[in-house]
Amino acid sequence: MTTSSLPILIVICGATATGKSSLALQLAEKFNSVILSADSRQIYREFNIGTAKPSLEECQRIPHYLIDICDPQDNFTLAQYQEQAEDLINNLHYSPLFLVGGTGLYIKSIVKGLKIPRVSPQADLRRQLQALGQSYLYQILTQVDEEAAKKIHPHDQVRTLRALEVFYLTGKPISSQQGENPPTYPILQIGLDCSPESLGKRITVRTDQMIARGLVAEVQNLGDKYGWDLPLLQTLGYAEIKQYLLGEISLEQAIDLIILHTRQFAKRQRTWFRADADIIWFPVDKENLLESVEREIILFLEGLSRPDIKTHHPD
């Protein structure tokens, strides 16, 4: 396969509320392309407002892929995401393609070519493990796979369960089954960043907008339809409104908690992405941000056509 026939991938990443989706939409229009989502909650149908899912109008402007691909009660693994994303990257006839989102592991699975254990979720095993409680599960993980435990937060039940699930079904630690096999096609990673103060203001505005758009009604409908124990209703934005709807806290308290938890989440995202030296960063408050990023992409594409310039390839 020649370089000219390879797909070209432009990644737009960064913390939540930095304007990734808006910028990507404008860039996709300028380059006559499409957008692949890298968001672990936008894959679920009916979870719209709280996940800041692209609107119908935005999807009509530019085709979006990897959103609304499974039902709220479905288990969707990183391996499934990687498989579907790679299939799209290799078969969509657009150049470049835009991969956009804030789920670092989704992006890393593509950019670094993570080797992921192909172990299907086992509902019965997960129920048995969950009954033991997250604290005890994490203790078990530290004993059977210390390397994985170092990379998983003690309160991250989803990844803890997955690591233990792989261990019990294969007899091998998940950390020993992981590795990297970077793709051969060219990749440019663009990161959006801003100061904590500016990001805090953006998060407050974004939260207020979600409430105004009907987040409370969305959560109520989801709880009524799927039950309040639905795992997705324990995630950011939904968990806090759920507490309000169940009479545990006031709406004002719920909004304050969403803002607080989103800021904490954004800080973790920023730390994750900052660890990748291949990302080229742009401040979101920069004048002419769109033009600056567009120019960076054009220079990258021009470089690919020149044999004297080395094609970008993840380490």
From Swiss-Prot:
It comes from the Bacteria. Gene3D superfamilies: 1.10.20.140, P-loop containing nucleotide triphosphate hydrolases. ATP binds at G14, A15, T16, A17, T18, G19, K20, S21. It catalyses: adenosine(37) in tRNA + dimethylallyl diphosphate = N(6)-dimethylallyladenosine(37) in tRNA + diphosphate. Keywords: ATP-binding, Magnesium, Nucleotide-binding, Transferase, tRNA processing. InterPro entries: Dimethylallyltransferase, IPT, P-loop_NTPase. Coiled coil: none annotated. The keyword Transferase applies. The record marks T103 as: Interaction with substrate tRNA. Its cofactor is Mg(2+). GO terms for biological process: tRNA modification. One of its GO terms (molecular function) is ATP binding. Substrate binds at T16, A17, T18, G19, K20, S21. Residues 39-42 are annotated as: Interaction with substrate tRNA. The keyword Signal does not apply. Its EC number is 2.5.1.75. Monomer. Catalyzes the transfer of a dimethylallyl group onto the adenine at position 37 in tRNAs that read codons beginning with uridine, leading to the formation of N6-(dimethylallyl)adenosine (i(6)A). PANTHER family: TRNA DIMETHYLALLYLTRANSFERASE. This is tRNA dimethylallyltransferase.
